């Protein structure tokens, strides 16, 4: 007799597969700009919060401090972001987009949103709202990352 996975496990596997598939599509698009998805995440977060600490950015992107340093080094080398010591706490670095980084973010963020929307378009808007509510409930129940 074949083992039947529990519904929760099957649902989790579907979520993983969807995230992988959509992630690959988004990564392919970001290659046109010579960006990884992680680098895009930095630009998008800095567009929304123009001047935040390096640690807060790492927390929001779910990456380690070491990974964040590498991401920022590469983006800084390309002239897309800049880091400055926090005037109130010299141990902390504040990160912001450069003019060039802001211009790139202004192009790629809307394109990213359109690609994600196109992936989701197979689901009716009301079903998308329901899915959003269900995932929000699960996220809250699981607690902080």
Q: What is each stretch, according to the model?
A:
Residues 9-13, 33-44, 66:
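Short alpha-helical elements of helix-turn-helix
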């Amino acid at each position: 007799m074949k083992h039947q996975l529990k519904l929760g496990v099957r649902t989790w596997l579907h979520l993983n597969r969807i995230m992988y598939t959509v992630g690959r599509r988004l990564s392919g698009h970001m290659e046109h700009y010579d960006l990884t998805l992680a680098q895009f995440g930095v630009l998008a977060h800095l567009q929304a919060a123009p001047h935040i600490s390096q640690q807060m950015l790492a927390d929001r992107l779910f990456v380690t401090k070491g990974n964040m340093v590498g991401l920022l080094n590469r983006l800084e080398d390309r002239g897309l972001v800049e880091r400055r010591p926090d005037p109130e706490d010299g141990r902390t670095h504040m990160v912001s987009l450069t003019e060039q980084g802001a211009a790139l973010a202004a192009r790629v963020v809307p394109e990213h949103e359109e690609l994600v929307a196109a992936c989701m378009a197979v689901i009716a808007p009301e079903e998308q709202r329901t899915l959003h509510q269900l995932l929000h409930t699960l996220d809250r129940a699981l607690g902080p990352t």
